[in-house]
Amino acid sequence: MVKYTVENKIIAGLPKGKLKGANFVIAHETANSKSTIDNEVSYMTRNWKNAFVTHFVGGGGRVVQVANVNYVSWGAGQYANSYSYAQVELCRTSNATTFKKDYEVYCQLLVDLAKKAGIPITLDSGSKTSDKGIKSHKWVADKLGGTTHQDPYAYLSSWGISKAQFASDLAKVSGGGNTGTAPAKPSTPAPKPSTPSTNLDKLGLVDYMNAKKMDSSYSNRDKLAKQYGIANYSGTASQNTTLLSKIKGGAPKPSTPAPKPSTSTAKKIYFPPNKGNWSVYPTNKAPVKANAIGAINPTKFGGLTYTIQKDRGNGVYEIQTDQFGRVQVYGAPSTGAVIKK
């Protein structure tokens, strides 16, 4: 059993929403290679109204708790949040020794939280909110929707840990005395095999693309979806299934040469880093505060630029985001947003 100390840094003022059921512990990773655990905690403390989880793991096996368990946290989308007993973020590192410690504690913490909630130590099993277990953010996106995130598998894979290995390590940790120590991991990143040992027919879109050494980022999947004629791609399970089928079928064959994009008419909207956050709204509802589904955070990225999908007038635009899909945003000049050609 791996020992760790929980650093209590509960964010003040968090809501205490009642769960519909303590069915999940959600496994995340931060997707920010340039940030530390302290930076992640600090950022979430300042911006919890956009999203928050319960725990961070990083910095060589440190655990920082920022929210109480057994309440609704806002880290996995509208369909999973109200069933999530806890949500855990694994911070990124480029140091092999640090990763080994982080991963060991990550597995132990996920198992410990699941046991406290009476949740079975299974990974990504089932397809409904009633199917209890430890769930990845990818499982939520693929099975429940409400999010397009695919973590933590790409990051774990970069250190030679497959989904099957992750599941095995969770099971070993759950055995307590049967493990003796935490699952042993290589001290250096394991090289990716030239030929995947996994049965490719059983892989989802992102895992399949990773196995084929393809760029599995949302932006590239969105690009491929357009090439294959999948309209309004937002990363839903059905769209991913269709895209996977088309990728397996070979390169797209347009009947006519694809026209070059017109740079003169494609306008973009720029959100500067020093003007705070911009709330986003569904495309089928009025862009008012009560309908906000989240916010984009230009400060975190030094500014953000999006192609305008549709100008709805009065300073309201439709944009395509990685986190929320296609949404409305209010970008009038008074907000500090800038329209560019």
UniProtKB/Swiss-Prot annotation:
It catalyses: Hydrolyzes the link between N-acetylmuramoyl residues and L-amino acid residues in certain cell-wall glycopeptides. Pfam families: Amidase_2. GO terms for cellular component: extracellular region. Keywords: Antimicrobial, Bacteriolytic enzyme, Hydrolase, Repeat, Secreted. Its EC number is 3.5.1.28. Residues 23-153 form the N-acetylmuramoyl-L-alanine amidase domain. Belongs to the N-acetylmuramoyl-L-alanine amidase 2 family. This is Endolysin. It comes from Listeria phage A511. The gene is PLY511.
